[in-house]
Amino acid sequence: MNVDFIAGINNLGEKIYTCEPFKTSFQNPFIVALIITAVVLVVFFAICNPPVDKKRKTKTAIYVYICIVALLFLHYYVLNHQLNDIYNKSNMDVIVSSIHDKYKGGDEIIPPISPPSVSNELEEDQPKKIPAGPKPAGPKPADSKPASSADSKPLVPLQEVIMPSQYNN
């Protein structure tokens, strides 16, 4: 499995164990809801003495069971939403940190690369031309004008001069 995914699951487990409202070590929210419901029922029976009459006892038992089921669903719903929020936040943290580690190389800051200018691209795309044959001996005067097209030698692309075997095949 992916190491980032496993690290994210471990991080999520730590956040579930330290759930703020309940501070519980149970991972299953249904068990937590059951414990909270049991505590509520104990308090309910401690405050309200159960009736002695058998008919009233049955009605009270039905109401108590309805209350138990309602409280279970309520606690499960609340806990489930809290755990989903925790999962979504930690999952997003894992995604952001894995993207940061993958493309930025950890804490290392990489400066942005500026795109090359248009003039540089045009110069690089066209091969440089140099005259074929040996260079004339002696220094060239600075104010001399180029020879006419009839006197000049044909220009050969620079790549052919440097690596002729690559282009002749």
Curated annotation (Swiss-Prot):
Entry keywords, A to Z: Early protein, Glycoprotein, Host membrane, Late protein, Membrane, Transmembrane, Transmembrane helix, Virion
Subcellular location: Host membrane; Virion
Compositionally biased spans, kind Low complexity: 140-154
The keyword Thylakoid belongs to this UniProt entry's keyword annotation: no
Superkingdom of origin: Viruses
One GO cellular component term: host cell membrane
The name this protein goes by in its record: Transmembrane protein B169L
Source organism (scientific name): African swine fever virus (strain Badajoz 1971 Vero-adapted) (Ba71V)
